[in-house]
Amino acid sequence: MNNSTNSSNNSLALTSPYKTFEVVFIVLVAGSLSLVTIIGNILVMVSIKVNRHLQTVNNYFLFSLACADLIIGVFSMNLYTLYTVIGYWPLGPVVCDLWLALDYVVSNASVMNLLIISFDRYFCVTKPLTYPVKRTTKMAGMMIAAAWVLSFILWAPAILFWQFIVGVRTVEDGECYIQFFSNAAVTFGTAIAAFYLPVIIMTVLYWHISRASKSRIKKDKKEPVANQDPVSPSLVQGRIVKPNNNNMPSSDDGLEHNKIQNGKAPRDPVTENCVQGEEKESSNDSTSVSAVASNMRDDEITQDENTVSTSLGHSKDENSKQTCIRIGTKTPKSDSCTPTNTTVEVVGSSGQNGDEKQNIVARKIVKMTKQPAKKKPPPSREKKVTRTILAILLAFIITWAPYNVMVLINTFCAPCIPNTVWTIGYWLCYINSTINPACYALCNATFKKTFKHLLMCHYKNIGATR
């Protein structure tokens, strides 16, 4: 019994470069990092799935990034830990190549997703009028699919079939590494394409994004808050619709007056005909006003502070006229590129002085929307998204740079890099997948609150968490 125990200890000592307590320590640390990576990225994916406020184009890119990081946490980290503590690759050449292909495809997909996020924000800032038209969920899905397909094409065939291309497998039994990394030209090319070029592009893009954002914030601060137009910059749209006069409601009652205060008015069976179908806005910042006027004189339309008084009249006359004005101010979602939209909809019937009365009501209500705004801080959604991109970019550069520098050095001087340093550099790339979910939570309060609700099993109203 003692002989068999001593034999197993001697075998471990011969194969593993680490002592027993070091192996235990490495397994505990690596296992913990793998677990945190898995939990963190599952939280990101579930949060985007259950919280409608996180279901934005920008966060769909983060969802794809979380998928890549989850695969790294489940497979790559644990297989590399096994390889490290044992001291040799025990699973054979086929599994070795499959692991390397999966590892590099997923890692490159992460880089591609970061590039997409950077380009997306860059176009949002530099082309705010033309890019939002193309920025749809379908387009986001196509870009994400392209990132994964391109990553697969770049890495998987070369890793899996290089031994057949050159006619021999030079990777020795018990070892697992990419065979073509022994070729200096190929190594330089892949390192530049997979790391250095993306980093340069992302850095330049972020510089432009940051400059444009600071310029916009500085411009907003220069304008006096009290004189700011709450609707500007906006796109004001108006359209006139003529309803069927035969459906006009009639009543024996005289002229009634309904006051709309703070954008809300009590509904009754008559006003319902005019205000029904009014567009509902999902954003808390959105406002909508419906004003109904009929058979009114110019002086019957009055305006007070935060109040619109409109006259609603009913007549037995079949030719009675009715005008409905709908104003909606649309505020974009947290990652939206689009400017604020104010829509003025005029619904009325034709008749004597009909157009004139529509114009009167429209002028009065549009004038109301342009009253001086109360003291209101500038929106921080743009700063929030820019800050998230910066955090992800910095985390990527810091964790990936050491390994990619060592890859270039290893091409000319393999003995120059100790195994321990190489292992740490390789693990730093994996740790990037652990850090990313923390970046989302630190830079986005909605992610942070949703994470908290999920971890504490508070599922009530989680879909509306902001």
Curated annotation (Swiss-Prot):
This is Muscarinic acetylcholine receptor M2. Residues 46-59, 120-139, 210-387, 443-466 are cytoplasmic. Residues 218-355 are annotated as: Disordered. Induction: Up-regulated in response to enterovirus 71 (EV71) infection. It comes from Homo sapiens (Human). GO terms for cellular component: cholinergic synapse; ciliary basal body; cilium; clathrin-coated endocytic vesicle membrane; dendrite; Golgi apparatus; membrane; nucleolus. The modification Phosphothreonine is found at residues 446, 450, 465. It is found in: Cell membrane; Postsynaptic cell membrane. The chain crosses the membrane at residues 23-45, 60-80, 98-119, 140-162, 185-209, 388-410, 419-442. Residues 1-22, 81-97, 163-184, 411-418 are extracellular. It is a multi-pass membrane protein.
